[in-house]
Amino acid sequence: MRHYEIVFMVHPDQSEQVPGMIERYTGSVKEAGGQVHRLEDWGRRQLAYPINKLHKAHYVLMNVEAPQEVIDELETTFRYNDAVLRNVIIRTKHAVTEASPMVKAKDDRKALAEVENNDFEDAEE
């Protein structure tokens, strides 16, 4: 089986359906004997340019190991699902399990905010 990186963008009005979509897609990978190595829900983000007069979209990143038939099925599902605005499926040489720069930056910001908040509370005392 080959390794793939999949990113898809969902219509912002359909954000509440994203967990169900993720479950359905990961389920189809696992049913075929594949494996999900990384799954990141980046949430609603600003688009670089408008797509269908929309300025935001809900982003999801998945790194999977799956047979080609499953990837073809996912690609067809993305194509005919009106909620999916854009998608990209890239074959990779090996499994990627470490956090993406998007998640790392988000975690760094959270850690920095906690440190600043603790420093502020210490200064008040």
Curated annotation (Swiss-Prot):
GO terms for molecular function: small ribosomal subunit rRNA binding; structural constituent of ribosome. SUPFAM superfamilies: Ribosomal protein S6. One of its GO terms (cellular component) is cytosolic small ribosomal subunit. CDD domains: bS6. It holds the Pfam family Ribosomal_S6. One of its GO terms (biological process) is translation. InterPro entries: Ribosomal_bS6, Ribosomal_bS6_CS, Ribosomal_bS6_sf, Ribosomal_S6_plastid/chlpt, Transl_elong_EF1B/ribsomal_bS6. Keywords: Ribonucleoprotein, Ribosomal protein, RNA-binding, rRNA-binding. NCBIfam families: S6. HAMAP family: Ribosomal_bS6. Belongs to the bacterial ribosomal protein bS6 family. This is Small ribosomal subunit protein bS6.
